[in-house]
Amino acid sequence: MNRNTMDIYKILKQLPHRYPFLLVDRVLAIDKGKSIRAVKNVTINEPFFQGHFPYRPVMPGVLMLEALAQAAALLAFDAIDTTPDEDSVYYFAGMDGVRFKRPVEPGDQLILEVELVRMKAGIFKFKARALVDNELAVEAELTCAVRKIA
């Protein structure tokens, strides 16, 4: 596999998330310290569709943002050449300019695009967006932080 991509096995080594909360299936491209393009395949089998909404399943917006944050984490860890361990955690620190533009439904492929704007002292600022069929689904500016917990 290309060094600039990640399959699910590499993703599992970088992110602590597991089913049902792992929301990145593959990294299509990563430009070290600059940007990442990843994918979340959305299926009817997602557990959140049972209640959101049974009559017309729609992916919750907060989970679209979480998928973007997970892609951002992969970009951040690659930028600083680290693999997270049990003594550190990657937190959301803020979201700005969040706009939802279209619903995401079963069968959609959510393309996650994240650009690293700046990083300093373990704080990362990103510009992020997710698309379905080249149509904007959500956009946001994300702030995340890596912190030691032990």
Curated annotation (Swiss-Prot):
GO terms for molecular function: (3R)-hydroxyacyl-[acyl-carrier-protein] dehydratase activity. Its main location: cytoplasm. Keywords: Cytoplasm, Lipid A biosynthesis, Lipid biosynthesis, Lipid metabolism, Lyase. It catalyses: a (3R)-hydroxyacyl-[ACP] = a (2E)-enoyl-[ACP] + H2O. It comes from the Bacteria. The active site is at 52. Transmembrane segments: none annotated. It is found in: Cytoplasm. GO terms for cellular component: cytoplasm; membrane. Coiled coil: none annotated. Its EC number is 4.2.1.59. One of its GO terms (biological process) is lipid A biosynthetic process. Involved in unsaturated fatty acids biosynthesis. Catalyzes the dehydration of short chain beta-hydroxyacyl-ACPs and long chain saturated and unsaturated beta-hydroxyacyl-ACPs. Belongs to the thioester dehydratase family. FabZ subfamily. This is 3-hydroxyacyl-[acyl-carrier-protein] dehydratase FabZ. It comes from Albidiferax ferrireducens (strain ATCC BAA-621 / DSM 15236 / T118) (Rhodoferax ferrireducens). The lineage of its organism: Bacteria, Pseudomonadati, Pseudomonadota, Betaproteobacteria, Burkholderiales. The gene is fabZ.
